[in-house]
Amino acid sequence: TRRFDDVLDEVKGFFEVH
């Protein structure tokens, strides 16, 4: 299970890279 913050961090990194 992932934490909401963890998911947000992944999304942030995704948008930062792209």
From Swiss-Prot:
Amino-acid biosynthesis listed as a keyword:
yes
Q: Please give the superkingdom of this protein's source.
A: Bacteria
Q: Which reaction does it catalyse?
A: D-erythrose 4-phosphate + phosphoenolpyruvate + H2O = 7-phospho-2-dehydro-3-deoxy-D-arabino-heptonate + phosphate
To which pathway does this protein belong?
A: Metabolic intermediate biosynthesis; chorismate biosynthesis; chorismate from D-erythrose 4-phosphate and phosphoenolpyruvate: step 1/7
Task: Give an example GO biological process.
Answer: aromatic amino acid family biosynthetic process
Q: Is the Heme keyword given for this protein?
A: no
**Top EC group:** transferase
> Mind listing the UniProt keywords for this protein, alphabetically?
Amino-acid biosynthesis, Aromatic amino acid biosynthesis, Transferase
Q: What is its EC number?
A: 2.5.1.54
A GO MF annotation of the entry reads:
3-deoxy-7-phosphoheptulonate synthase activity
Q: For this protein, what post-translational modification is recorded in UniProt?
A: The N-terminus is blocked.
Name the family the entry cites.
Belongs to the class-II DAHP synthase family.
Please give the subunit comment from the record. Answer: Homodimer.
> What protein is this chain from?
Phospho-2-dehydro-3-deoxyheptonate aldolase
Identify the species of origin: Streptomyces rimosus
Gene behind the chain: aroH
